[in-house]
């Protein structure tokens, strides 16, 4: 859900870079699951990492060269020329995710990550990748509750080749029966590895389904097993026609390109693709929660207990509380000096990892707080510590020093993103899709500076209520625990 405003809002650990190396295309939520699993295995103690002090300058060099254009078919294009190195990228943001699904077709948005690389009426399955790699490029894709994003990186000399490839798969995607069945099996296997056979993945899925009772954020991005088994070709074709339309997409290109060159190629390759009727709007509003919800998963494959709290955030991405929520999350969880790490990991040694992350999107999402216990850890003690630490923040607020550190971390993340063409493309797409205007990206430093300690405390008081949360535990089954104790 949350692909935030600032490029570092969802702190991405080093382990996740494996995704690009091995070409794993997975929903965003499962990348966090992977990172937690790696943290437990390797002794890493946080999803987040400290950053250097941010520069005070707010003007991004080169931003004055950004040019945008909307084609007659509704495709929005943003170009940020950056000639430091002879590379460019091609980021396509489709406004479709699991929030656009319903029982019977859950997981379709993610399924298209696979289909989009498996042939067109002009090209065989796998040819997209072969041509791109022969041109010196690489690619990836990701699906969240709100969007599906396709990312290409390549030498700028290959720009027209990329335009041809991308236009072809939008205009002429193949729906071959054998490919559909093959990829259905791949996705089902992916679900087993990231959810069904992953205790934390199962916990996250069931907590989302418990926290959201009306809004489609309750559906897992990967899809439910029975739906994965039963999608029809007609389902796929209708979904693609509805959501993979130029008027439902934003294209961002950053790097060693000229806007006139980009727009000429867009007119040649993308403008002929017909717009489609606007997708049905999601108007459902999740009812206010009036009592704590709890669930317990007992799993024989759970190595250690894990607890998570999921609080309704009360704000969509780009809402007025977004900067304050980002700073609250940072104070709670970013770095070894953060409140949760210091209390549960360093001081009390009640957890091997403790942290938080935010999932917001077009609609209000969740603030997640979690702790992973050591083998044999005291679950009641760990939950009580989390409650106590959150209650302190609500009651006493945050210090000026914490605010300064949090602002510096967010600003430093902002400027790191602005230092690369991929960071620029991601941020422009995030702001255009979630905020409605990419120019608001450059207001981010001032937005963080404007948040006060009182703002953060007021937001904490608003959302960190037991009646506003779902609590979930995943623990080893008693039989599994007994076996471990008998065979240490």
Segments (PLM) and residue ranges:
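Active-site His/Glu-centered metal-binding helix of metallohydrolases
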Residues: 108-116, 328
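M16 family metallopeptidases and their MPP-like homologs
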Residues: 80, 85-103, 107-111, 125-170, ...
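His/Glu-based metal-binding/catalytic segments typifying zinc-dependent metallopeptidases
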Residues: 192, 209, 278-337
């Amino acid at each position: 859900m949350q692909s935030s405003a600032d490029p570092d809002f969802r702190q991405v650990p080093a382990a996740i870079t494996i995704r690009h190396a091995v070409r794993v295309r997975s929903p965003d939520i499962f990348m966090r699951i992977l990172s937690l699993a790696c943290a437990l295995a390797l002794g890493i103690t946080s999803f987040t990492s400290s950053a250097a002090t941010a520069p005070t300058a707010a003007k991004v060099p080169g931003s004055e060269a950004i040019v945008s254009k909307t084609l007659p078919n509704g495709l929005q294009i943003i170009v940020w020329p950056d000639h430091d190195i002879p590379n460019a990228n091609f980021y396509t943001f489709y406004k479709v995710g699991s929030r656009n699904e319903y029982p019977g077709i859950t997981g379709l948005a993610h399924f298209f990550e696979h289909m989009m690389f498996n042939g067109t009426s002009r090209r065989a399955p796998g040819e997209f990748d072969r041509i791109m790699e022969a041109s010196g490029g690489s690619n990836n894709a990701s699906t969240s509750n709100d969007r599906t994003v396709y990312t290409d990186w390549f030498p700028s000399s290959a720009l027209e080749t990329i335009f041809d490839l991308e236009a072809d798969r939008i205009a002429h995607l193949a729906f071959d029966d054998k490919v559909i069945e093959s990829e259905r099996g791949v996705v089902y296997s992916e679900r087993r590895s990231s959810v069904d056979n992953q205790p934390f993945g199962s916990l996250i899925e069931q907590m989302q389904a418990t926290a959201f009772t009306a809004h489609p954020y309750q559906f897992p991005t990967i899809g439910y097993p029975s739906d994965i088994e039963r999608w029809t070709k007609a389902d796929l074709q209708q979904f693609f026609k509805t959501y993979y339309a130029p008027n439902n997409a934003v294209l961002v290109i950053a790097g060693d390109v000229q806007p006139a060159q980009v727009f000429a190629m867009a007119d040649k390759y993308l403008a002929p693709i017909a717009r489609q009727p606007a997708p049905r709007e999601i108007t459902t509003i999740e009812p206010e929660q009036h009592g704590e919800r709890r669930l317990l998963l007992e799993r024989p494959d759970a190595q250690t207990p894990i607890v998570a709290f999921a609080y309704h955030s009360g704000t969509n991405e780009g809402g007025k509380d977004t900067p304050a929520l980002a700073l609250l999350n940072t104070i709670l969880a970013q770095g070894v000096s953060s409140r949760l790490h210091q209390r549960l990991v360093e001081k009390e040694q009640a957890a091997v990892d403790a942290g938080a992350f935010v999932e917001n999107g077009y609609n209000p999402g969740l603030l997640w707080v979690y702790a992973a216990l050591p083998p044999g850890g005291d679950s009641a003690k760990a939950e009580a510590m989390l409650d106590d630490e959150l209650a302190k923040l609500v009651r006493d607020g945050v210090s000026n020093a914490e605010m300064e550190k949090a602002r510096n971390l967010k600003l430093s993340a902002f400027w790191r993103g602005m230092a690369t063409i991929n960071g620029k493309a991601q941020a422009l797409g995030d702001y255009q899709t979630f905020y409605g205007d990419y120019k608001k990206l450059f207001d981010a430093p001032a937005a963080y500076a404007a948040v006060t300690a009182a703002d953060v405390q007021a937001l904490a008081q608003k959302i960190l209520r037991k009646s506003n949360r779902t609590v979930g535990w995943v623990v080893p089954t008693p039989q599994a625990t007994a076996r471990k104790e008998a065979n240490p």
